[in-house]
Amino acid sequence: ISFYSKYEIIEKGSIPFVSNGDAMYADVMVKGKRIRFVNVYLEPFQLHKSMVKPTSDLDENGAKAKSLVRRFMPVFKKHEEQVQILKNFIEKSPYPVILAGDFNSVPNSYEYYTISGVLKDCFLESGTGLATSFHDYKIPIRIDYVFSSENLKSTHYQVDRSQKLSDHYPVLVKFSLKD
């Protein structure tokens, strides 16, 4: 993960995770106001299409389902740890926060619920449609998010489906600064 900004970056650093996930922050001066941007990539599930593709054999499908559950449980545990680290970091921030990234979690998850308890979901504030950003398994799901502090207002939220840069479409959000 990385940051690119046309505005001055005042400070930057990493947020330590003890697994394959990654998180970093950058404090940026925007029109005289310091804003903390946090970029996150939570632990991946490392799934392959063959693991989720159903077959005509019910026994094989049952075995696949059990295998997926065994694979999911340790990742969910790592997500819990990573999200608690993020939540603590956000709560200690002296500046307004914009948090964005690949959470590898759907909107009815522990991860989403925990972060939406300290920041607002920009899609709910200014988005329309489904906001599905992951497209690789032909199952459109929303696992990429942009959250912000209450004193920042998102004015436009869009998933740009014209750009296939990876297995995720880019998410674009415009903000206005509240006084």
Regions found by a protein language model. Give the residues of each.
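Structured beta-strand-rich core segments of catalytic domains in phosphoester-bond hydrolases
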Residues: 1-50, 146, 158, 162
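Metal-dependent phosphoester-hydrolase catalytic domains
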Residues: 14, 80-81, 88-97, 103-179
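Soluble or luminal CAZymes and related metallo-dependent hydrolases
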Residues: 18, 71-85
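Short aromatic-enriched loop/helix-cap "lid" or pocket-rim segments at secondary-structure transitions
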Residues: 48-52, 109-112
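Short acidic/polar alpha-helix capping motifs at helix-coil junctions
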Residues: 50-53, 77, 123
